[in-house]
A protein has these predicted regions:
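Left-handed beta-helix
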Residues: 1-105, 129, 261-508
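Glycine-rich N-terminal loop/short-helix segment of MobA-like nucleotidyltransferase
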Residues: 105-131
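Structured alpha-helical segments in the cores of large, soluble enzyme domains
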Residues: 109-113, 137-147, 222-234, 375
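Conserved core of the sugar-phosphate nucleotidyltransferase
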Residues: 172-333, 337-343
Length: 508
């Protein structure tokens, strides 16, 4: 605590100056943050046993908030990205795949497993959601790694980064699966936690329920967590140099030797897998080029300027900003250690300022600022970092139950190696657009009771479900289908979807 307070003495001087009615020029005069904000936040972080490097980094981000920094990346600061390589182009270079296969023994896989399935009505870790029959995301990840080891003879470890919300669940499940990593490497490590800040007076959150005072710091914490927990050093000691990091709910994120070979061949310290944006992606973050240093930069929607509460139209210009981050990245662990050593044990990352109710289950509760960072934003911290455009097959996230319906259907097939791929019967067509009535399908429990038998979607272009329906028997969706019923009450028995009704609802 003493070290943190001493390091941030200048900021505390600013608090003292404010109490005396004097504002330094560097601080926003409208902030009106209470005296002692930095000391109180530092003390709370220390009490929560957060590492010194994490506290220092958090206080740095907090100072930006107190100074009025919103983390916004303005249009005149960035430009479009051109001329990035594609997986298709490097896949034709057989020497890259061979190089990657030879280096698999020095690779480790890390899955981001800190999120709950709350958006789908699940109180547990999202990776415990059944996605194919009884198989969960976790089951599929384990199967993939075990098949990779058997096929290649290389002991590639699988390590989960958990959060204070998911750590117990994930460790229990991995123990039940009797999963162990080679070289006695740990199966999990836990990311840190950030203190919430009240929006109205910029003081640290002090709710009676202590868990409401904290938020996960965003997946940008992976760098600090790797270093502070000692995982980075353990991996290095075990001969691991390369990391493949991906979201636990991305079924398309698998080890690709040709990408690893590409990194090694070009001595790339950081590689981000990107996909080409479509109209459906225009509300999400995008890749750009920083005009000040010509480096790649990531702009998330929370960092986009707004006009009268609406994000500027340039943000959604998919012609200008045509690449988005899949959140699958490849890292040179030696470069991570080297760059972090230059910045007090952390990789410098831009501020993401998320405003939410202090109790997310009570929208009327007091608003707070959640101080977060994004893993992909580190692309601008690594000289020589690259982006690689990959096909949509490597980006198959399950964010909503509409995604889950598609994954459970025959549009996908489950392969022997634990991977999920588009079924050949689809002819390579883009996935159908699926819209499920949120009143009856948004929560996993409701979805499970209403989708007892997923419909066939191989020949579907779109499916829209309005009202209280139940899929209980096999039906085939062809073309564009809209199912609408007058049954709009949750307490009523759902209407049964039959093939006859589906054929009548066809809008081709």
């Amino acid at each position: 605590l003493a070290e943190a307070v001493f390091f941030w003495g200048k900021v505390m001087d600013a608090n003292q100056a404010q109490s005396a009615g004097q504002f330094p020029e560097s601080l926003d005069r409208k902030a009106n943050f209470p005296p002692g904000t930095i000391e109180l936040a530092s003390a709370k972080m220390c009490t929560a046993q957060q590492p010194q490097a994490v506290i220092t980094n958090y206080l740095n981000l907090l100072q930006k908030v107190l100074n009025g920094d919103t983390g916004i990346i303005h249009e005149n600061e960035i430009g479009p990205v051109e001329g990035i390589d594609t997986l298709q182009s490097i896949g034709a270079q057989s020497h890259l795949s061979s190089l990657g296969k030879q280096a698999l023994g020095s690779l480790a896989v890390i899955r981001l497993n800190g999120g709950l399935g709350s958006s789908m009505g699940m109180p547990t870790a999202k990776s415990l959601l059944p996605v194919r029959g009884t198989l969960t995301f976790n089951d599929l990840m384990i199967r993939q790694l075990e098949c990779l080891r058997k096929e290649t003879g290389h002991n590639v470890p699988l390590i989960h980064m958990t959060s204070f919300r998911t750590d117990e669940d994930i460790n229990l499940v991995m123990q039940q699966a009797a999963y162990c990593n080679p070289e006695d490497l740990p199966v999990t490590f836990r990311q840190h936690q950030h203190l919430k800040i009240y929006l109205d007076d910029l003081s640290p959150a002090q709710e009676s329920r202590d868990d409401l005072n904290w938020n996960p710091p965003g997946h940008g914490d992976i760098y600090a967590a790797l270093l502070a927990t000692g995982i980075a050093q353990k991996l290095i000691d075990a001969g691991k140099r390369w990391l493949f990091v991906a979201n636990s709910d991305n079924l398309g994120a698998t080890v690709a030797p040709e990408i690893l070979g590409y990194m090694i061949h070009y001595r790339c310290p950081f590689l981000m897998e990107t996909c080409r944006r479509t109209e459906a992606d225009k509300k999400g973050g995008h890749l750009a080029k920083n005009k000040s240093n010509d480096r790649l930069i990531l702009r998330e929607v929370a960092q986009a300027p707004t006009i009268e509460g609406e994000v500027i139209p340039e943000f959604g210009n998919i012609g200008r900003y045509h690449q988005f981050n899949t959140n699958s990245i490849w890292l040179d662990l030696q470069s991570v250690v080297k760059i972090a050593a230059l910045h007090d044990g952390c990789i410098p990352l831009p501020l993401i300022r998320n405003i939410k109710p202090v109790d997310t289950e009570d929208p009327s509760s007091r608003k707070v600022i959640q101080i977060e960072t994004a893993m992909g934003a580190a692309i601008e911290s690594f000289p020589g970092a690259r982006a690689l455009e990959v096909p949509r097959g490597r980006f198959m996230p399950v964010k909503h139950n509409s995604d889950l319906l598609l994954v459970r259907s025959d549009w996908f097939r489950e392969n022997a190696d634990g991977t999920i791929s588009q079924h050949e019967s689809t002819g390579g067509a883009p996935p159908p657009t699926i819209s499920l009535d949120p009143r009856f399908f948004s929560m996993f429990g409701d979805f499970s009771s209403r989708v007892l038998h997923p419909p066939s979607l191989v020949h579907a272009k779109s499916l829209k479900v309005i009202g209280n329906w139940q899929f209980k028997e096999p039906v085939i969706i062809r073309g564009h289908v809209v199912l609408e019923t007058q049954n709009q009450e949750r307490g009523q028995t759902p209407d049964l979807v039959t093939q006859e009704l589906v054929d009548k609802a066809n809008r081709n």
